Amino acid sequence: MTRPLIISDCDEVLMHMVVPFAQWVDEAHGVVFQMEDASFANALKRKSCGTPLEAMEVWPLLDGFFTHEMHRQMPIAGAIDAMLRLSTAADIVILTNVGPDHQPRRVDQLAAHGLHFPVIGSRGGKGDPVAALIAERAPTLTVFIDDLAQHHHSVADAAPDVWRLHMVGEPAIADKVRPSRAAHARIDDWGAAEAWIADILRAGAPAPALTTA
């Protein structure tokens, strides 16, 4: 018998990312991370002169962080216990844009904190991977959780019946990120988020359509 499915991002939903990343690039690369709007790349500037990094300089830093520094990441408050409780009522898959190369490290990272769920290391928009998971698993309903608005738009296009929760669990940047118009709710606290998800699982209805234009 199929169950509901929760598809969750990891960074800034389950694990802190930008704060430990900022500490590392400061210490190891002389780069300051100061987020003034929703742009991640524009937040990275050289300490020596204040000029922003080019886009091609950002990806190697992210790759280096996920290769060597994931131990710096700690869970978002309440995330682990909430996911474990929700797993009694739904299947859970972690869909994280670290790419396939870092997928094994993400599996180990989450397992070290007690989360033993399937992990998919994707790249790009999450709509197609979400649609593929739904086709494979045929869940009774699906809830998608992510901190990035573009992924909610992608999922809304590819799988419109999915409930979409916009969550930015890092307090240092939450107020810099506008609520996604493609999400059914914006909740940055796991206590309230767990209650919202649990209500949806109990109701068992597909998500209503949203106007995202």
Regions found by a protein language model. Name each.
Residues 7-9, 95, 145, 167:
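Short hydrophobic segments within beta-strands
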Residues 41-72, 123-145, 192, 196:
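N-terminal/domain-start segments enriched in small and hydrophobic, helix-friendly residues
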Residues 53, 64-94, 100-107:
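Short, acidic loop-to-helix structural element flanking the phosphoryl-transfer center
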Residues 118-124, 184-192:
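Short acidic-hydrophobic, aromatic-tinged amphipathic segments that line or gate anion-handling sites
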Residues 1-58:
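Active-site neighborhood of HAD-like aspartate-dependent phosphohydrolases
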Residues 99-143, 150-157:
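Substrate-recognition "cap/lid" segment bordering the active-site pocket of phosphatases
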